[in-house]
């Protein structure tokens, strides 16, 4: 357990501090490349102040979501009983690190900041992940599947409300959505069970609190 705790603690510090590095190219970079190849301007640089604030609020919410994803996966992996399940959770967490780095970069580009409450979000999510992990792999995987289903719905909403001209944010969110769908599918295929309705409803309520606060703070 101690052998896993040390690297997980390091990962936690990096997630909260916002110093993670992506292992994959940022999807937003393709927007710049496309604009350059066609000699067109990147419209994401022409956002009105209202659109900039709205896009930054949504990307801050997404950044918080990725901080929470790191914590959830780390808490679950720490108590996973099947080594194969632990490996699957670790691999998903590494992809979520990409999302975290992309969102952090986009917030900088929008001249905004991450949530001031990130340490609180991380601590709460880690505790939830650890409890899910202690309840057994099937429940833990079911929690992953339900979380990713709700995140997919949440990202769909962001794609509906992000400014059309903010092509960089939209590219990041679209790739995140594809990854989250795959993570949820993998969890179900690995044996994740459907969670009871009261738990799903509690998860949605907690998500609403987080997204409302993170949009502003």
Curated annotation (Swiss-Prot):
<keyword id="KW-0479">Metal-binding</keyword>
<feature type="binding site">
    <location>
        <position position="66"/>
    </location>
    <ligand>
        <name>Fe cation 1</name>
    </ligand>
</feature>
<comment type="function">
    <text>Catalyzes the hydroxylation of 2-nonaprenyl-3-methyl-6-methoxy-1,4-benzoquinol during ubiquinone biosynthesis.</text>
</comment>
<protein>
    <recommendedName>
        <fullName>3-demethoxyubiquinol 3-hydroxylase</fullName>
        <ecNumber>1.14.99.60</ecNumber>
    </recommendedName>
</protein>
<keyword id="KW-0503">Monooxygenase</keyword>
<dbReference type="InterPro" id="IPR047809">
    <property type="entry name" value="COQ7_proteobact"/>
</dbReference>
<feature type="binding site">
    <location>
        <position position="180"/>
    </location>
    <ligand>
        <name>Fe cation 1</name>
    </ligand>
</feature>
<feature type="binding site">
    <location>
        <position position="180"/>
    </location>
    <ligand>
        <name>Fe cation 2</name>
    </ligand>
</feature>
<feature type="binding site">
    <location>
        <position position="96"/>
    </location>
    <ligand>
        <name>Fe cation 2</name>
    </ligand>
</feature>
<keyword id="KW-1003">Cell membrane</keyword>
<dbReference type="Pfam" id="PF03232">
    <property type="entry name" value="COQ7"/>
</dbReference>
<feature type="binding site">
    <location>
        <position position="183"/>
    </location>
    <ligand>
        <name>Fe cation 2</name>
    </ligand>
</feature>
<feature type="binding site">
    <location>
        <position position="148"/>
    </location>
    <ligand>
        <name>Fe cation 2</name>
    </ligand>
</feature>
<comment type="pathway">
    <text>Cofactor biosynthesis; ubiquinone biosynthesis.</text>
</comment>
<dbReference type="GO" id="GO:0008682">
    <property type="term" value="F:3-demethoxyubiquinol 3-hydroxylase activity"/>
</dbReference>
<keyword id="KW-0560">Oxidoreductase</keyword>
<dbReference type="InterPro" id="IPR009078">
    <property type="entry name" value="Ferritin-like_SF"/>
</dbReference>
<dbReference type="GO" id="GO:0046872">
    <property type="term" value="F:metal ion binding"/>
</dbReference>
<dbReference type="InterPro" id="IPR011566">
    <property type="entry name" value="Ubq_synth_Coq7"/>
</dbReference>
<feature type="binding site">
    <location>
        <position position="99"/>
    </location>
    <ligand>
        <name>Fe cation 1</name>
    </ligand>
</feature>
<dbReference type="GO" id="GO:0005886">
    <property type="term" value="C:plasma membrane"/>
</dbReference>
<feature type="binding site">
    <location>
        <position position="96"/>
    </location>
    <ligand>
        <name>Fe cation 1</name>
    </ligand>
</feature>
<dbReference type="GO" id="GO:0006744">
    <property type="term" value="P:ubiquinone biosynthetic process"/>
</dbReference>
<comment type="similarity">
    <text>Belongs to the COQ7 family.</text>
</comment>
<keyword id="KW-0831">Ubiquinone biosynthesis</keyword>
<dbReference type="InterPro" id="IPR012347">
    <property type="entry name" value="Ferritin-like"/>
</dbReference>
<keyword id="KW-0408">Iron</keyword>
<keyword id="KW-0472">Membrane</keyword>
């Amino acid at each position: 357990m101690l052998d896993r705790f040390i690297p997980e603690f390091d990962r936690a510090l990096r997630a909260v501090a916002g110093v993670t590095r992506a292992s994959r190219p940022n999807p937003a970079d393709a927007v710049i490349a496309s604009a350059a190849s066609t000699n067109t301007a990147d419209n994401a640089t022409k956002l009105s102040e209202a659109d900039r604030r709205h896009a930054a609020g949504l990307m801050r919410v997404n950044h918080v979501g990725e901080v929470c994803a790191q914590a959830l996966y780390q808490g679950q992996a720490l108590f996973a009983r099947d080594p194969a399940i632990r490996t699957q959770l670790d691999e998903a967490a590494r992809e979520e690190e990409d999302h975290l780095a992309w969102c952090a970069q986009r917030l900088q580009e929008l001249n905004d900041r991450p949530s001031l409450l990130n340490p609180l979000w991380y601590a709460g999510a880690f505790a939830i992940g650890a409890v899910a992990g202690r309840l057994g792999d099937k429940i833990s995987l079911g929690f992953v599947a339900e979380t990713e289903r709700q995140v997919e719905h949440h990202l769909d909403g962001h794609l509906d409300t992000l400014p059309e001209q903010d092509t960089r944010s939209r590219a990041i969110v679209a790739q995140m959505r594809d990854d989250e769908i795959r993570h949820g599918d993998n969890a179900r295929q690995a044996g994740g069970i459907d969670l009871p309705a009261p738990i799903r409803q509690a998860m949605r309520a907690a998500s609403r609190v987080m997204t409302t606060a993170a949009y502003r703070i």
